[in-house]
C-alpha cells in the first residue's frame, strides 16, 4: 500500500506510511514520556513500527491543522492524546503503519496483509453466519478480521469478543464499506460503518463512531 494522507472531514484525517522510509526522520516532536517509551523498546522492528505509527498520526494531525500533543495508553491498551482532546487509533503490518484522528468521536483503524491462515483461524473470531457468506476465501476472511479489529479498537474496551460480540453484515470483495455491530456485550449496542481500501495484498479498514 502506498504512502497517503487523507482528510476525511475538517474534524478527522488518517495517514498511511512506509516504516522504512521514516527511519531517518526526527523524533523531536515526541513528548518526554514518549521518548522514554521509545528508548525502552529494544527490538529493531518494534522500534520502527512504533516510530512509523507516531509519524503517521503526526501527518494526520497536520492535515487538520492540529499540533502533536503526545499520546499514552490507558488500562485497556487504547491510545489517547495527552491533552485530553480528540481520539486516535494506530496500526501497523509488515513495513506499513497507519493512524487516524478525530477531534470529537472515537475512531478505529487496522492494516492487514491478506493471509491464508485467516481461514483456519476463522472459528476463533467469526460467527457461523459470517463464515457462511465468506466461503473460505482468504481475501474475504482478512477483510472480516480487519473490520472486526477496527470496530474493536473504536469501541475501546477489553472484554469484547470478536466472535461473540461483533457481528458483520454480508459483504463482497469489491465492497468499499462493511456494516457491523457490537451487541450482547454488557455495554450499549452500537452499529458501525467500516470503510475499506484494498491495494495489492494489503487491506486498510477504518471507522468513526
PLM feature spans:
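Core catalytic alpha/beta fold that binds nucleotide/phospho-ligands
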Residues: 1-209
